[in-house]
Amino acid sequence: MTIQQPITAPVPQETAPAEAPAKLTPMMEQYLDIKAAHPGLMLFYRMGDFYELFFEDAEVASKALGIVLTKRGKHQGQDIPMCGVPVERSEDYLHRLIAQGIRVAVCEQMEDPAAARARGNKSVVKRGVVRVVTPGTLTEDNLLDARANNYLLAIARSRGSSGGDRLGLAWIDISTSDFIVTECAFAELTATLARINPNEVIISDALYSDEVFEPVLRELAAVTPLTRDVFDGATAERRLCDYFAVATMDGLAVLSRLETTAAAACVTYVERTQVGQRPPLAPPAREATGSTMAIDPATRANLELTRTLAGERRGSLLDAIDCTVTSAGSRLLAQRLAAPLTEPAQIGRRLDAVNVFVADSAAREDIRAILRGAPDMTRAMARLSVGRGGPRDLAALRDGILAADQALGRLSALDQPPQEIAAAMAALARPARALAEELSRALDEQLPLIKRDGGFVRSGYDSTLDETRNLRDASRLVVASMQARYADQTGVKALKIRHNNVLGYFVEVTAQHGDKLMSAPLNATFIHRQTLAGQVRFTTSELGEIEAKIANAGERALNLELEIFDRLCGQALAIGDDLRAAAHGFAMLDVATALAKLAVDDNYIRPEVDGSLGFAIEGGRHPVVEQALKREGQPFIANSCDLSPTPGHKSGQLWLLTGPNMAGKSTFLRQNALIALLAQIGSFVPATRARIGIVDRLFSRVGAADDLARGRSTFMVEMVETAAILNQAGERALVILDEIGRGTATFDGLSIAWAAIEHLHESNRCRTLFATHYHELTALAAKLPRLFNATVRVKEWHGDVVFLHEVLPGSADRSYGIQVAKLAGLPPAVISRAKSVLAKLEAADRGQNARALVDDLPLFAVPSRAAPEPAMSKEAEELIAAVKALHPDEMTPREAMDALYALKAKLPKG
């Protein structure tokens, strides 16, 4: 967790120092005033082409960015630390600071330095903070992950009468205008936050100081405590109404008091960080409780839904299924994966859309080709709405509207499109085509990234602009002809007319010709301005007049372009809701066609999803592992699983899975959880048939990891996660558990696993997959009617184990741990000793005195040299000799079969 700590500038002390300190410059006084008005923020203070940082800000930035720390002047007798970053590269530095949880106030020059000089020598350029950059309020492309939402989330609390807190949550993405609210109990908060995955969380300072919330806050990326007035429920509705410019919220959304408070906190924080600007947001959409599958953070991490355990996207489930071709589509797919649906009808509508594009490959590929040309309109709109957009953002809107026309034309050929596709088509039809036509006429072919320097309006669009540009360009041609005339007049062929920001236009000659221009009669025309080491510079009254004309024409042309930009921007923002709807339509089509491509390429089938407690998967495969094996040219062994209620029982089954390590137990557990999850996001699934009754909660206890920061051992983490499952899982949950109890003594672990199985069977009564190495547990099938024993098939060959990865009814009689250890490369001496110990343990009576067993098998009886090979029997020697005498390459199939039977006959009987 990153907590926003205040970054402060020193305050002048009232007591005078021993020696008079250097007086602060007017500029530094201005800096300290602005800094004091923005506590807790790093201040980027604009000075010309740089953002300067001073005092503690400079020290923090120097370390965070790896830039040189220097000094500028003194304060209270001490050097003032200083560093700076160039304005043109500032967004790169902002990205690095934001990634470290540092919030930044950007302070710009609000006037031209010439205006300050005109007021007097001691006047300072007017400056002001124009925005506050925080992790949850970003809009720039290079500060955002194009494939992920960037959520700001607010939490409001209400004390329950029975002691149970209720929480209101509101989360927004100002880069896409998304705005969602919900309520939850404190016990549900961790799972809800894991699903939303906010980039920044704002809470009241009272909530921040509450010890009960400390474990929750620790798991969050960035937490910003705010004063209580931001979470004032009495003013919340008024603040929301002000933001949306309505008299009442009733026409936009019906929210609870807690939801209203959290939503108001969000918009208040946005207004503060955007310095009074109000990015357009969708009306708050209320998320119904229980409408999505609940998945706790541990399960999300263990199943590697969006990130692997190493924190990488590559190798996750999202990476495996993401075939989208647009950023908006990728974001929507990630949203769906984070929140699988629990309503069969909604799931069915999504599956219908995917099915259309599975069946019609031509339509699928045509739509995907169109989508590749559809830009990210929502984020372009967000930048334009807060004054950070450029000409390319306007072009994105133009191209998006044109792509919408293309998509509609192709989709119109579909016969009775399903509801999801029909909704996307309706959204694509909303934006007025007149805007695209206007933008096409106005924008040039080659567009600059920013509007500041102009050059983006097409010639012929505005006659006044064309005339002004002609005047500007003609004046520059006059300068070129003037240079030729001055060269003839002076006889100095090397004479040049140049320009810089200090002198403006000037005549430049080499030093050897300088005296000539400063002597009569040329000195009447050429006025000396500057002498350098090798050049002398002059001006003329004629050149001054031309410069004024060029400057005026250039400035006027730029102002005209900026006026045109603002007008076009206003036209776009006026239909912002329609443009955002079209962008969402693109995203819906992208997800549907992407999942269809995945289904066709990887042979997925449409699942049957209903309200039963069924769970029958035939030929199921792990979507991520299968792709990894495919890249290596290896097949994936499919397996079936049926946790559906058996005849005479209402609740689902509990499968007890035994088998050796590396046989595929964990893969089998995970693949069934992932298939259920894919089905409920509306995707086809990797199986030959799948019937899944809605899963309302998904739990997993797989893998092993400690939590040293919270003082938890690996076993403690395992027990905490198991406790959550046993306390929370209901009949409609799906639970996967892998080797419960392995982190402690054998009999302790066996006892815990035994009791957990009984509790899951009798109390939770949920559909469960339970993998274990405790073979004694398989005996529970005799007394627990819904427990089914399954095992992963293996085969031994000459002392080695061959993993067949097939799940079959039955139970394993051994774990093959020593064979797996041998495969891992343990020294032969250790393997030999392990076999010897295992033989004695298996022969020993488990009830015998422990001391006697330890005496028989001392823990540290490690041989000082390699263990001797066991003596070989005469029969074994004869078998080896017979095998060595065979030459398979020279034998016919019949001869090989006869030889095999002959060898078998030599084996000892019994």
Curated annotation (Swiss-Prot):
Q: Which PROSITE patterns match?
A: DNA_MISMATCH_REPAIR_2
Biological processes, Gene Ontology terms: mismatch repair
Which controlled-vocabulary keywords does the entry list? ATP-binding, DNA damage, DNA repair, DNA-binding, Nucleotide-binding
Output the Gene Ontology cellular-component terms: cytosol
Q: Which Pfam families match?
A: MutS_I (PF01624), MutS_II (PF05188), MutS_III (PF05192), MutS_IV (PF05190), MutS_V (PF00488)
Q: Which residues does ATP bind?
A: G659, P660, N661, M662, A663, G664, K665, S666
The protein's superkingdom reads Bacteria
Coiled-coil residue windows: none
Keyword Translocase recorded: no
GO molecular function annotation: ATP binding; ATP-dependent DNA damage sensor activity; damaged DNA binding; mismatched DNA binding
**Record-linked PANTHER family:** DNA MISMATCH REPAIR PROTEIN MSH1, MITOCHONDRIAL (PTHR11361:SF34), DNA MISMATCH REPAIR PROTEIN MUTS FAMILY MEMBER (PTHR11361)
Give the protein's function: This protein is involved in the repair of mismatches in DNA. It is possible that it carries out the mismatch recognition step. This protein has a weak ATPase activity.
Report the family membership.
Belongs to the DNA mismatch repair MutS family.
The name of this protein is: DNA mismatch repair protein MutS
The protein's gene is named mutS
